[in-house]
Regions:
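Nucleotide donor/acceptor-binding cores
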Residues: 42-44
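Conserved S-adenosyl-L-methionine
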Residues: 46-49
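Hydrophobic adenine-recognition pocket in adenosine-nucleotide-binding enzymes
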Residues: 116
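Class I (Rossmann-like) S-adenosyl-L-methionine-dependent methyltransferase catalytic domain
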Residues: 1-37, 52-102, 141-227
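Hydrophobic beta-strand segment of the Class I
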Residues: 111-112
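A short glycine-rich, Lys/Arg-flanked "PGG" loop and its adjoining helix->strand segment in the class I
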Residues: 124-141
């Protein structure tokens, strides 16, 4: 696994989505999951990221019940920083899970994880994936994006908005620079923390029943896993 130095900024504010020209990308994983979302049955869908009117509309137009939670923003709260037995800086995973992703077991039919594992602090990734497993129904689907080895530490973090069954709009997420709550002024971007290879991705989702990789494009590989 390839790691990058640097960290994200803690902030009381929500991530700001830049007004630069918006980009779109075709998503094979989205295309696959859209078949499930075409079901006449009402599904519970968890969209991890800042509230997206596009995504809410896409889900509700199909009769589904959407939930949204910005777990990445919550993960950079400086109050979560602690030290392990060796004195290494880690995040307090127990506190984080007590305050975030608090849903009944086997509650969701579909979870859009997007690029969360690539930008979240290393000590939180496995606990969060474990929590996602527990709140996803057996047979439920999870979609995640992972950067390839060609991506650098400054690879921008995007919020993905669903335009149609296989097309996503990408908006660069920027955190307002400030020095409040111990944040370092001038650090305004989520930084790519690591690059997972296929073996690491398989290990991350080892408790899931099935995993499917889609052909990577734009230095991003898409992964769909089944609970």
């Amino acid at each position: 696994m390839k790691f990058f130095r640097g960290s994200s900024t803690g902030s009381d504010q929500s991530p700001r989505q830049t007004t630069a020209a918006k980009m779109t990308r075709r998503s094979s994983g989205m295309g696959e999951i859209s078949r499930t979302l075409s079901s006449e049955e009402t599904l519970c869908v968890l969209d991890l990221g800042a509230t997206s009117p596009n995504n809410i509309r896409y889900f509700t137009d199909r009769g589904h019940k959407p939930y949204s939670e910005d777990v990445l923003l919550s993960s950079i709260d400086p109050a979560l920083v602690t030290k392990d037995d060796e004195g290494n800086r880690v995040m307090d995973e127990r506190r984080f899970l007590a305050e975030n992703l608090v849903y009944p077991a086997a509650h969701f039919d579909v979870i859009f994880c997007w690029n969360l594992p690539d930008y979240m602090d290393e000590s939180l990734v496995k606990p969060v994936v474990g929590r996602l497993w527990s709140i996803l129904k057996p047979g439920g689907l999870l979609l995640a994006f992972f950067h390839t080895k060609d991506a650098g530490p400054d690879a921008p973090c995007y919020r993905y908005h669903i335009l149609n069954n296989d097309t996503l709009e990408m908006q660069h997420i920027v955190i307002p620079a400030q020095s409040a709550r111990g944040a370092l002024a001038g650090e305004s971007n989520f930084r790519l923390q690591r690059v997972f290879n296929n073996r690491h991705i398989e290990n991350l989702f080892r408790d899931f029943a099935n995993i499917k990789f889609f052909l990577a494009r734009d230095n991003v590989r898409e992964v769909m896993v089944v609970r």
